[in-house]
């Protein structure tokens, strides 16, 4: 929990005591993040091009909102009344973590996640099934036969994909950030190769 600064700001000529704000509750912080991310999403592009790979998109804003809401719904922050949670108070004794469990937080988090998935931009990266092989790209090692999945194409099964290569390609640099459909937001690299 942090203090939420009002939108109108402060007169910085005031004393520290006058500028001091108490911390807001965890739930108030999550509500603020959710509201701001929805507002940001309205002004962000749906997709990014190669020159703006490190810039946030609508999906990045909505995913940030969804993640904050998932944390708020989790047992750590939702109805936690252990010794640590009881110590999380302001100077006036106000509890910063709500000790009352609220099941509706899970519904709100699920709806926020569905907003991201509903954009239709992000999906699991898959490499095609390969019957030929080379040193760099071995033939697909087929998983053991399973009557429900072996004879169906992805996403219902694995007949047309290479599960190992689908995973490996994301980590060996073969799939660039621009070509990775799983990537919601990235730091990327600048022209000199240094991390941004």
Regions found by a protein language model. Give the residues of each.
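Structured, solvent-exposed acidic/aromatic patches
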Residues: 1-195
């Amino acid at each position: 929990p942090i203090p939420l600064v009002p939108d109108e700001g402060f007169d910085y000529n005031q004393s520290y005591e006058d500028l001091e704000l108490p911390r807001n509750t965890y739930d108030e912080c999550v509500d603020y993040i959710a509201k701001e991310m929805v507002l940001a999403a309205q002004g962000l592009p749906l997709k990014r091009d190669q020159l703006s790979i490190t810039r946030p998109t609508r999906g990045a804003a909505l995913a940030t909102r969804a993640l904050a809401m998932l944390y708020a719904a989790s047992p750590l922050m939702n109805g936690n009344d252990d010794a640590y949670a009881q110590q999380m108070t302001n100077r006036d004794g106000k509890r910063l973590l709500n000790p009352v469990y609220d099941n509706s937080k899970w519904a709100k988090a699920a709806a926020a996640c569905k907003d991201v998935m509903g954009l239709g931009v992000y999906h699991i990266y898959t490499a095609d099934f390969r019957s030929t092989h080379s040193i760099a790209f071995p033939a697909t090692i087929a998983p053991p036969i399973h009557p429900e999945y072996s004879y169906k194409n992805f996403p219902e099964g694995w007949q047309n994909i290479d599960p190992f290569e689908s995973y490996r390609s994301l980590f060996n640099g073969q799939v660039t950030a621009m070509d990775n459909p799983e990537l919601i937001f990235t730091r990327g690299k600048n022209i000199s190769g240094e991390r941004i």
